[in-house]
């Protein structure tokens, strides 16, 4: 893959998450009854960062959990057409709560659909919202994010790579040309 550009550096990611945190607070008129659920891998640390920002702004903790979606078959080379839920972990009830799913990149929406199904199978929330760091287009399902860090229209030959300190040792979002 050939690097085209760096879309967000560590400071830009931090500013973006602060903005998303403010938008969540404003839209929900506070943070009462809000639960953040990160879509593993990179959605979970993003959800934790948003929760930390919200606590700093509002002075209230927000519960954070995760849903683990399997995107690959056992050989780890072929992406599944229909992602499946591996596990969901949230230590609080989501019944009648406002659940905000958090993911790094919104692409085909299949992962988000699987996460929505997992949340609905767990319990009946008041509603589900979606926050993403990057929306790159190419949706296959009628799902849109309520909170978007950055809209990046891409071609199908481009790859968006989100790197986070918690997993990759650095914070950045880069776009690559995939060489087929």
Swiss-Prot record:
Q: Which residues form a coiled coil?
A: none
Transmembrane stretches in the record are none
UniProt cross-references to InterPro entries, sorted A to Z: PRibTrfase_dom (IPR000836), PRTase-like (IPR029057), PyrR (IPR023050), PyrR_bifunctional (IPR050137)
Record flagged with keyword ATP-binding: no
Q: Which Pfam families does the protein's record reference? A: Pribosyltran
- Enumerate the Gene Ontology biological process terms: DNA-templated transcription termination
Q: Which UniProt keywords apply?
A: Glycosyltransferase, RNA-binding, Transcription, Transcription regulation, Transcription termination, Transferase
The UniProt entry annotates the motif PRPP-binding at 99-111
Gene Ontology molecular-function annotations: RNA binding; uracil phosphoribosyltransferase activity
EC number(s) recorded for this UniProt protein: 2.4.2.9
Q: How does it assemble?
A: Homodimer and homohexamer; in equilibrium.
Q: What is this protein called?
A: Bifunctional protein PyrR
């Amino acid at each position: 893959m050939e690097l085209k550009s760096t879309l967000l550096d560590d400071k830009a990611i931090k500013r973006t998450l602060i903005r998303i945190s403010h938008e969540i607070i404003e839209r929900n008129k506070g943070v009462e009854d809000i639960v953040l659920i990160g879509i593993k891998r990179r959605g979970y640390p993003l959800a934790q960062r948003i929760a930390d920002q919200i606590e700093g702004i509002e002075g209230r903790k927000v519960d954070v959990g995760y849903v683990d979606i399997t995107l690959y078959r056992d050989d780890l080379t072929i992406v599944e057409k229909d992602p499946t839920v591996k596990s969901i972990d949230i230590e609080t009830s989501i019944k009648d709560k406002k659940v905000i799913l958090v993911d790094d990149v919104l692409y085909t929406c299949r992962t988000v659909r699987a996460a929505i199904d997992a949340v609905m199978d767990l319990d009946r929330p008041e509603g589900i919202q979606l926050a993403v760091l990057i929306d790159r287009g190419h949706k296959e399902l009628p799902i849109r994010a309520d909170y978007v860090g950055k809209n990046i229209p891409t071609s199908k030959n481009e790859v968006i790579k989100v790197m986070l300190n918690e997993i990759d040792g650095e914070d950045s979002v880069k776009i690559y040309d995939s060489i087929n």
